[in-house]
Amino acid sequence: MRPVGLRELLSIRVDVAPIVDLGGGRRYVPFDGGTFEGRDGLAGTILRGGVDWQQVRADGVIEIDAHYALASTEREAVEVRSRGLRAASPEVAARLSRGDAVDPDEYYFRTHVRFTTSAPRLDWLNSILAVSTGRRDRDVVTIDVHEVL
């Protein structure tokens, strides 16, 4: 069996607005911008208007479905789709909800990430799978993305 490897791809820092509660465990988090930086000269901004749709399950686990766009420093657009889970003990979840600083080792925040772009320089992003680890702070989510080799 061939093992799966990972290679650092980029770090995304998303500025988030307050959560909008839709009831029944459904909610969303609007993206207000942000930045990204990574290997091979990848850098730029997070465009406003992205959203992280969430379902808070009965067991407290949050199902994540984020859809947003990046704009590179070369003005290349990249669509990002990220799905995953954030799980924490009730105590840690309460601290996160209050906006307290919480060590990311105290909770599980993982997603799989797909990219779509028509930019020739970044075409290779269309052909990779990626996974990420996340960190939630008061008004910022930091996502460290790794290419699956």
Question: Where do the model's predicted regions map?
Answer:
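Beta-strand-enriched cores of mature, soluble protein domains
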Residues: 1-149
